[in-house]
Amino acid sequence: MSFKKLIFIFIFITAVSQSIADTKITSDDNHQMNFYLGNFDFSDHKQKALLVGFQHQDENLSRDTILGNVSPITGGFVTENSAAYIYTGIEWNVDMGSMVFTPSFAPGLYHEGDGKDLGHILEFKSEVQLSYEPSDTTNIGLSYNHVSHASLDDKNPGANSYMFNFLKKF
């Protein structure tokens, strides 16, 4: 997929989301931190590595849409091979009773350290997460993501990761 197509899709999704969003911004002072631990690039046996990360969600900026609850996210992770990724993006929280389905998209900056060369500093993270909500302030879940630069350069191996998540609202 070309970079121009990716930008067009991102702008289209943003415009549609804002046009159908409920204009009321939630007034709660809730923030959510997601602490996660997992396996970076588990599908590449030579490059797979342990990763640890965090993600912040500010529910003061969330909006209810027909797609579910949409909110901005910011986070990052490091691997045991000193690779690092910092990102900011958007996630959709789809409430399914005591379960929450959360797809997200976040562009960010990647530093390979002694880890895998992903081919570019600008990378895009797409993720799906399924979590269980045992209480109003705590979720535990499992997530899968793919980090890739969408063919901005010739080399584009991408990385697939899975994580165990602990989410806490405060």
Predicted regions and their residues:
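Cleavable N-terminal export/targeting peptides
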Residues: 1-28
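Mid-chain, well-packed structural core segment of small domains
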Residues: 99-126
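Outer-membrane beta-barrel "beta-signal"
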Residues: 48-54, 157-170
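Solvent-exposed loop/turn segments connecting transmembrane beta-strands
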Residues: 40-50, 76-87, 114-121, 151-159
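Short loop/turn motifs that connect adjacent beta-strands in outer-membrane beta-barrel proteins
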Residues: 20-30, 44-45, 60-70, 95-101, ...
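Residue-level signature of outer-membrane beta-barrel architecture
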Residues: 56-58, 92-94, 132, 146, ...
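Outer-membrane beta-barrel architecture
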Residues: 36, 53-55, 89-91, 129, ...
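Transmembrane beta-strand segments that form the barrel wall of outer-membrane beta-barrel proteins
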Residues: 32-41, 67-79, 102-111, 143-148
